[in-house]
Amino acid sequence: MRLITSFLLALLITSCTHKMSPTVVIYQGDLRVSFNSIGSGINHSAFDKFKAYLDDYNAKADPKVAYQITSTGREGEKDVCVQANGNRNFAGLVQHINDLLKGEKWVNIQEHQDCGKK
């Protein structure tokens, strides 16, 4: 009987410990994805896949992400700036974008950027 009482008392004491809530990290800066060219135009399949992903994300997510496409060259080069705007899910979005575009030729991903400056 003492053993059971001791066990229940120990269980009660250990279950009363304060549990830490997970810390939410706010992503700092924006994400810039550059589609470059070396004389034959950009990787259109990667650009189309990326743009479709952003549009699909915005169709399902709340809050949505703002992005801006800027032409940067004569061969169709583009910079896409995806703005964090304090979105708590932005770090996960950045990881998905990195996975989506991993191994794509002539695509450069820059994290923690200021899209107002280059």
Annotate each PLM feature.
Residues 17-19:
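Bacterial signal peptide processing site
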Residues 69-84:
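Surface-exposed aromatic
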Residues 44-65, 97:
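Short amphipathic alpha-helix segments
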Residues 1-5:
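Positively charged n-region of N-terminal signal peptides that target proteins for export
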Residues 22-39:
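Short glycine-/aliphatic-rich beta-strand segments at the starts of folded cytosolic domains
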Residues 12-15:
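C-terminal motif of bacterial Sec signal peptides marking the signal peptidase cleavage site
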Residues 39-40, 83-91:
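Helix N-cap motif at beta-to-alpha junctions
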Residues 91-118:
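C-terminal partner/receptor-binding element of secreted or periplasmic proteins
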